[in-house]
Design a protein with these regions (language model features):
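Membrane-proximal basic amphipathic "stem/tether" segments
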Residues: 1-70
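A conserved helix-loop-beta module that forms one wall/lid of the active-site cleft
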Residues: 55-134, 143, 149-163
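Short, flexible loop/turn elements at secondary-structure junctions
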Residues: 104, 125, 176-178, 193-195, ...
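Phosphate-binding site of ATP-dependent enzymes
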Residues: 115, 141-230
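A short, polar/proline- and glycine-enriched secondary-structure boundary/capping micro-motif
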Residues: 132-133, 210-217, 285-289
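Short acidic-glycine loop/turn motifs at beta-strand connectors
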Residues: 135-136, 193-197, 269-271
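A long amphipathic alpha-helix within ATP-dependent nucleotide-binding catalytic cores
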Residues: 167-171, 215-275
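C-terminal active-site "lid" helix and adjoining low-complexity regulatory extension at the edge
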Residues: 250, 268-310
Length: 310
């Protein structure tokens, strides 16, 4: 590492609590803390206010409460990138899932010869362990194995104590390659459901641009909510309601009917919906809302008094 970059990293560690906390988490510094103590330690560093687990009010606080107090085994199935497909197919139909081509227990088991010329490889237990092959003849298989091997070694549940990932079998799946999923113009629709009732949709755009992902929030009537979420500013222009919006609502309600909270991610490609993933803790519940009043507004939709501790 160049001296200038090393100095920059060191300065960030010393002056930015958010950055310092991420480095310490990655190093395993907090691994011996209980989930409750860990979350109370890091929450203020990310959010700017202390975590109250006894009387949580904001949406972000209530997500931390759910991490500590609500543990339904089906959640592990729903975040498993392989098993979630079966769950989705049984609930709403297999026409909404991206076909799986193969599953392996380790990178050494991957048989590239059985795959088509284009495919996607993913680790089943975390976020970010993805490799895309657009052409086998130029595909760097060794680099792909190195990336996936590093992903398989990572305990994703430790990063923000998202416990559902802890017991997901660490495997590699190969999926059908859908070219539109890599398009700069593709929109990602993330629908938030509270106690089985869809309440808002986040439209993610510019996912592959130099400026980074933008997020625009809409209420159930597709009215802009004016939310700036974490490091993802909204675009000034608004997006039209998708033609498949009512179908998204129906699918989200069905998939989330047994959940205090669930986010369902959709892609709309040539009029057809695909479900990307199911998420219980958007941004790990550690992304700021601006204005902060929106964090309280969403918190009012999550009724913890109806949730049975487990």
């Amino acid at each position: 590492m160049k001296l200038s970059k090393l100095c920059k990293v060191g300065m960030s560690f010393l002056t930015k609590p958010y950055y310092r906390t991420r480095v310490l988490i990655k190093s395993g510094y907090y691994d011996n803390l209980s989930d409750e103590d860990f979350l109370k330690k890091i929450f203020p560093k990310y959010m700017g206010y202390p975590l109250d687990l006894e009387n949580p009010k904001t949406f972000s606080e209530k997500l931390q409460w759910l991490k500590v107090n609500y543990r339904n085994p089906i959640q592990t199935v729903m975040v498993d990138k392989h098993k979630a497909k079966q769950f989705i197919a049984e609930r709403v139909g297999n026409q909404y899932i991206i076909p799986t081509l193969a599953v392996w227990d380790s990178v050494e088991d991957i048989d590239i010869d059985v795959l088509p010329n284009q495919f996607v490889l993913k680790s089943t237990h975390d976020s970010g362990g993805i490799v895309i092959c657009k052409d086998k003849s130029s595909f760097d298989f060794e680099a792909a194995k190195a990336k996936l091997s590093a992903s398989l070694k990572r305990d994703y549940s430790k990063i923000a104590r998202e416990w559902p990932y802890q017991n997901v079998p660490r495997r590699i799946i190969a999926e059908e390659y859908i070219s539109e999923l890599g398009s700069d113009d593709l929109l990602d629709y993330k629908m938030f459901s509270f106690h089985g009732e869809p309440k808002l949709t986040v439209v993610c755009s510019d996912r592959f641009s130099k400026t980074g992902t933008r997020m625009n929030f809409y209420d159930i009537n597709w009215e802009p909510m004016g939310i700036h979420f974490g490091h993802y500013p909204p675009l000034p222009n608004e997006f039209p309601k998708p033609a498949t919006y009512e179908e998204m609502k129906r699918l989200t309600a069905e998939l989330s009917k047994d959940c205090p909270f669930l986010r369902v991610d959709f892609y709309e490609i040539k009029g057809r919906l695909f479900i990307g993933e199911l998420t219980f803790f958007p941004g790990a519940g550690l992304e700021t809302f601006r204005p902060m009043s929106k964090d309280y507004e969403l918190g009012e939709w999550l009724h913890l008094e109806t949730v049975h501790r487990s």
